[in-house]
Amino acid sequence: MIPVTELRYFADTQPAYRILKPWWDVFTDYISIVMLMIAVFGGTLQVTQDKMICLPCKWVTKDSCNDSFRGWAAPGPEPTYPNSTILPTPDTGPTGIKYDLDRHQYNYVDAVCYENRLHWFAKYFPYLVLLHTLIFLACSNFWFKFPRTSSKLEHFVSILLKCFDSPWTTRALSETVVEESDPKPAFSKMNGSMDKKSSTVSEDVEATVPMLQRTKSRIEQGIVDRSETGVLDKKEGEQAKALFEKVKKFRTHVEEGDIVYRLYMRQTIIKVIKFILIICYTVYYVHNIKFDVDCTVDIESLTGYRTYRCAHPLATLFKILASFYISLVIFYGLICMYTLWWMLRRSLKKYSFESIREESSYSDIPDVKNDFAFMLHLIDQYDPLYSKRFAVFLSEVSENKLRQLNLNNEWTLDKLRQRLTKNAQDKLELHLFMLSGIPDTVFDLVELEVLKLELIPDVTIPPSIAQLTGLKELWLYHTAAKIEAPALAFLRENLRALHIKFTDIKEIPLWIYSLKTLEELHLTGNLSAENNRYIVIDGLRELKRLKVLRLKSNLSKLPQVVTDVGVHLQKLSINNEGTKLIVLNSLKKMANLTELELIRCDLERIPHSIFSLHNLQEIDLKDNNLKTIEEIISFQHLHRLTCLKLWYNHIAYIPIQIGNLTNLERLYLNRNKIEKIPTQLFYCRKLRYLDLSHNNLTFLPADIGLLQNLQNLAITANRIETLPPELFQCRKLRALHLGNNVLQSLPSRVGELTNLTQIELRGNRLECLPVELGECPLLKRSGLVVEEDLFNTLPPEVKERLWRADKEQA
């Protein structure tokens, strides 16, 4: 006989799956165990006990056995004796019924009558119970075995248990308690449109966060050790981070379908149908389980009798078991019907964390759907605490807190100080690249002046940025930064320069337009779409103190808002990435402009609107499509113009009107196709910087000597063969770039350039260097750019002096 304890194997599932079993599944499993016991008990009795006990019947009335042999004396027809050839003779004394059958004949009669005359329900009752119970068990546990559902269930249970036991769950919730116990008001994060949402502080921590009711500790007494609740070690942090990733991937995968829900529904429907079927036929056939059974079989030739009276020894017990079984099936069926009603009444393919959002500080926990929602509903039937603790790993706020903790552990103050550098403006700069957020230790660098954030998604600027009293410049490269209200208040008063680079319009935080004291704004990104231009550019009207505006994009025309802002702009720079920029007449309104840059705007002529900007001091038309600059004559009206950059164009000649720009100090004409320099150029007596490199020049006019203020001359990459002696009358020359020409010799008068600190000679046809180079007192070896073998043609004392000058500087 099978031990009762072994029957649990048929009903038990994996222990981990127990949390997916609601109370009704637990009840039905135990009912199934009892049904199995009934089946095994009944089957065991049938195997071990006599199935049927039969005796021949000597007194037969109408093919039925008379219950008493005295019936033959009763009035009426005389009984027949079909089962015997021996006629009874009256006996005056007591007598018994004797049969002349041996044991084998009795066994044979028992077997034949059991097989042919006992009702099938009484015969197979234990096996029917076993069959139906196994079907019930299969229906109840099929979803745990079916590959398409078992994989999801196994993965879900594994993640759920890890989330429940994770140290981050307890510590994150403990931080919630601390935050809600803090009397200081909480500031809500501002979104792109700077909507402010007030946040309230709860007084009853335990009531606000019921998730912690089972884990009461020192927090319950108002004592919180921040080192325990706020810091995770590296291993715990990595484990929690991995859990967040697993939950995200699992949610994406499971929410795609509802196969678990549909399979569970079908299992329940099958069990209800099975219940109805069992009740119908069992109640109908249970009365066929009888103790007395008349058996009429045609075996008279073997035993001498045809009619027998048989007893079914197990009938009474089977009837009791059948009644008990029917009651169990009814109870089982009612539970199944309740399950079906529960599934049909409730929307189980949607799960809302509304109550948890209200109870905790994690108001961003999303609702879930399909199989994910259904499994959470089942978990709630087991213990709602599981879903409440699991919700922590669905919250982006919680993930950001964990990310911040891990970030703080990785980026210590010493490590950040090692990353500090000095930029070109001699400002102390920190560049953070591809991090998950801003380490809190950054705000301990009180000496920081420039903060660069690049490729940092979903970063939030906290109020602690107010500690950076020296911060004046902020870079946001592909970083959609949010900001808290106190931080915005600080930046509004202190930030002077802002650089933003984006590929998607969503990467531009709209709170930047509330920076009332902002003086310099750099925007780099695609503004080709009309709506993008409106959203991004239109907010510039709010920046009343803006002085410098740089746009690197692909505009087809100058937006009106730029013109409106231009009333107080001092510098406007547009790098149009090669897209043709038209309709520049609105530039006339920017009367206060001192610097104008129109770079890569595909300009073919110098825009006439520029000539109305009388305050211009610097014009940069780099990398356009300029072929002629006849309009340069109009520059004479720009009396303050000191710098003109016409580099990287296709200019073939310089108009003689260039001489009218008498205030010009810097002129960039490099990377063009100029073949000749007009004498009028040298009327610009104030020129200090002249760049004519990478052109087609073959000589320098002797009038170059008129530029007595010239400090830097670049004629690199031309075809110049000789240098005019007048060049060396420019005694203020500090840098002379002569590389990649066809110079045969360097005049000895080079020694007259007493201010020379750098001379480039590489790439010429020089055979030797003049000794007079040693007469340039400020020239060092590092400032002499020449081939090594050519340098070795100098006398040893000259070389020694140049080397010594380098060492003294070092």
UniProtKB/Swiss-Prot annotation:
Membrane-crossing segments per the record: 24-47, 124-142, 265-286, 317-341
Tissue specificity: Expressed in brain, kidney, ovary, lung, liver, heart, and fetal brain and liver. Found at high levels in bone marrow; lower levels are detected in peripheral blood cells. Expressed on T-cells as well as on B-lineage cells.
Residues with glycosylation annotation: N66, N83
One Pfam family from the record: Pannexin_like
Family annotation (SMART domains): LRR_SD22, LRR_TYP
GO cellular component, as recorded: cell surface; cytoplasm; lysosomal membrane; membrane; monoatomic ion channel complex; plasma membrane
Cystine connections: C54-C310, C57-C65, C113-C295
Phosphoserine: residues bearing it: S202, S217
One MF term in the entry's GO annotations: cyclic-GMP-AMP transmembrane transporter activity
Extracellular side: 48-123, 287-316
UniProt main location, coarse: membrane
Catalytic activity: chloride(in) = chloride(out); iodide(out) = iodide(in); taurine(out) = taurine(in); L-aspartate(out) = L-aspartate(in)
Modified residues (Phosphothreonine): T200, T215
Regulation: Inhibited by (4-[(2-butyl-6,7-dichloro-2-cyclopentyl-2,3-dihydro-1-oxo-1H-inden-5-yl)oxy]butanoic acid), which plugs the channel like a cork in a bottle by binding in the extracellular selectivity filter and sterically occluding ion conduction. Lipids may block conduction in closed heterohexameric channels.
LRR repeats: 399-422, 423-445, 447-468, 469-492, 493-515, 518-542, 543-565, 567-589, 590-613, 615-637, 639-661, 662-684, 686-707, 708-730, 732-753, 754-776, 778-801
Disease connection: Agammaglobulinemia 5, autosomal dominant: A primary immunodeficiency characterized by profoundly low or absent serum antibodies and low or absent circulating B-cells due to an early block of B-cell development. Affected individuals develop severe infections in the first years of life.
Family (UniProt): Belongs to the LRRC8 family.
Subunit structure: Heterohexamer; oligomerizes with other LRRC8 proteins (LRRC8B, LRRC8C, LRRC8D and/or LRRC8E) to form a heterohexamer. Can form homohexamers in vitro, but these have lower conductance than heterohexamers. In vivo, the subunit composition may depend primarily on expression levels, and heterooligomeric channels containing various proportions of the different LRRC8 proteins may coexist. Interact with GRB2. Interacts with NOX4; this interaction prevents the ubiquitin-mediated degradation of LRRC8A.
Protein's name according to its UniProt entry: Volume-regulated anion channel subunit LRRC8A
Native organism: Homo sapiens
